């Protein structure tokens, strides 16, 4: 499970960085997005509620928020797994992220339809290379406020 979350964090990191000088970012990207599903090579991956991380995009940065089960079935903020704010950039329908540790760019195709955003990436799993599709749902302002409260507790 931990390897899955690390892989998920890596994939999300790949799609979640932007530079301040990029002016073609769709305004629709800005806001909070909650993971709904992951598909690897057309095979759905089951997710618990606590595995449904949140990405928050501002005009210049993104932040990834992860959760864990507190042992009672309640999802709580996982500070250790969450990723601090990072810059990102967008070119058309491609989000380009840079892994700051190795300075390598990772592109991911994205599409926004209504309140859903879909990312398509090449991911490396234990069984090799996979075509991964991640679908997120846009959070309401109230849901975003609740996420911020979880972070601050």
Predicted segments, located by residue:
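Positively charged n-region of N-terminal signal peptides that target proteins for export
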Residues: 1-4, 18-19
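Sec-dependent signal peptide hydrophobic core
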Residues: 5-10
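C-terminal motif of bacterial Sec signal peptides marking the signal peptidase cleavage site
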Residues: 14-16
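Lipid interaction determinants
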Residues: 19-83, 91, 96-153
């Amino acid at each position: 499970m931990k390897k899955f979350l690390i892989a998920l964090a890596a994939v999300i990191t790949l799609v979640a960085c932007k530079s301040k000088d990029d002016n073609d970012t769709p305004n629709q990207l800005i806001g909070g997005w909650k993971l709904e599903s992951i598909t690897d090579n057309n095979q759905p991956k089951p997710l618990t509620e606590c595995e449904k991380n949140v990405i928050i995009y501002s005009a210049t940065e993104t932040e990834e928020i992860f959760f864990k089960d507190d042992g009672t079935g309640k999802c709580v903020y996982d500070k250790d797994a969450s990723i601090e704010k990072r810059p990102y950039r967008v070119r058309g329908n491609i989000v380009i992220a840079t892994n700051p540790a190795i300075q390598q760019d990772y592109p991911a195709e994205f599409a926004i339809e209504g309140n859903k955003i879909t990312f398509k990436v090449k991911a490396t799993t234990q069984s090799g290379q996979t075509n991964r599709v991640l679908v997120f749902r846009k959070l309401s302002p109230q849901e975003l406020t609740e996420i911020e409260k979880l972070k601050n507790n």
